[in-house]
Amino acid sequence: MTTSSNPPNSAAPNQTSGMWGGRFSEATDAFVAEFTASVQFDQRFYKQDIAGSIAHATMLAKVGVLTEAERDDIIEGLSTIRAEIEAGTFEWRIDLEDVHMNIESRLTQRIGITGKKLHTGRSRNDQVATDIRLYLRDEIDDILGLLERLQKGLLGLAAKNVNTIMPGFTHLQTAQPVTFGHHLLAWFEMLVRDTERLQDCRKRVNRMPLGSAALAGTTYPIDRAYTAELLGFEAVSENSLDAVSDRDFAIEFNAAASLIMMHLSRMSEELILWTSAQFKFVNIPDRFCTGSSIMPQKKNPDVPELIRGKSGRVFGDLISLLTLMKGQPLAYNKDNQEDKEPLFDAIDTVRGSLMAFADMIPALVPNVEIMREAALRGFSTATDLADYLVKKGVAFRDAHEIVGKAVALGVAEEKDLSELTLEQLQQFSDLITADVFDKALTLEASVNARDHIGGTSPKQVEAAIARAHKRLEQLYA
């Protein structure tokens, strides 16, 4: 416990006073003031805080709580303060706790007693909830823009690779041939769902808590709908207790952010594998890689590796917010000061990761021949041979058994099924004829046969890309 031998109201170095002080008989201990302050991190809300205050003052003048002259003085003062902050001349003071009190104190310093009227009908509880929602709404819009750019990059790369054949994997073992374009469209679909989740989250973020005051509302004749219109909110909150106390909208964002990072991490894992000497499927340009301080030959895929690593911190940010909120009674508690850093970190990490991916993906260079050669290893057309037999009347389980024996021969002779002779294949079934090579065993036959919506045939991939462009137009309209 920090103690002091100074008189209760002295201006001792380890004490400070706040703007809420009337009820207190001694100043706040200096360490406690620093420990409980949030201005070190919530100052990034300054634009939203000032916008909210301007709207609040405008509304107070409309309902007659402020005069028009007082409103104009407040707006002019707040506009000047914003300019000071952006010029780097504003002095942020820890003894004033947070962004709200720092700005209000400076306003009062500039325009006098009128500045003290700004907080009429408002609490920091609804003020900060409004700031967070305004800030998060802006950040969601920025993140959606990055998602759109990444999605367009994926579609552009997919369009160049509708005929590029590569092995598809299950259990990281060769499964069936797919086109590289089809694989890229799988990533695209994941990001579409991420986009839809964020857009849906934004709808719930875009509800205005301002006017809820501390917890029960205010006695002043406020016009919340007018304030909401000024700030671009779709609606006002329905319950004052809920409006100031819950942060589920921030949790929802962090959950959506976690899913984005999970998808980016999976993409990163594949890129890391594909750029290795063991795969060599793709080349990442040098500008997205680094080298080794000791091994001259190294070209490390640092961007996807970092994004894979950063996914864990965003998951942690989600758990931090869930844990923060789970034990709180209504309404506002000081615990909620801890909501900002996990939210900020998730926002910053997702934004940076998407920016890196949006720049990197269009620049990827596939090694087409190496991909094709890899698809020829691992008996990727085995299922096609089984389907070939089924179409000739063999029950699927029997066909499965027949092809399994053919694969065993291929393993023994170190040959792909397409490299076995017709005579070798016919020893397992006399229904296998010369057309098997064109209809089942070539890579092109395999991918072309999957000619349905969602399939990997080049024709379907081209159609899927065309549909995807239209979906993007609708998604971001």
From Swiss-Prot:
The keyword Secreted does not apply. Its main location: cytoplasm. Pathway: Amino-acid biosynthesis; L-arginine biosynthesis; L-arginine from L-ornithine and carbamoyl phosphate: step 3/3. It comes from the Bacteria. One of its GO terms (cellular component) is cytosol. One of its GO terms (molecular function) is argininosuccinate lyase activity. It is an enzyme of class 4 (lyase). Keywords: Amino-acid biosynthesis, Arginine biosynthesis, Cytoplasm, Lyase. PROSITE patterns: FUMARATE_LYASES. It catalyses: 2-(N(omega)-L-arginino)succinate = fumarate + L-arginine. Gene3D superfamilies: Fumarase/aspartase (C-terminal domain) (1.10.40.30), Fumarase/aspartase (Central domain) (1.20.200.10), Fumarase/aspartase (N-terminal domain) (1.10.275.10). The keyword Cell division does not apply. It is found in: Cytoplasm. Its EC number is 4.3.2.1. It holds the Pfam family ASL_C2. Transmembrane segments: none annotated. Coiled coil: none annotated. GO terms for biological process: arginine biosynthetic process via ornithine; L-arginine biosynthetic process. Belongs to the lyase 1 family. Argininosuccinate lyase subfamily. This is Argininosuccinate lyase.
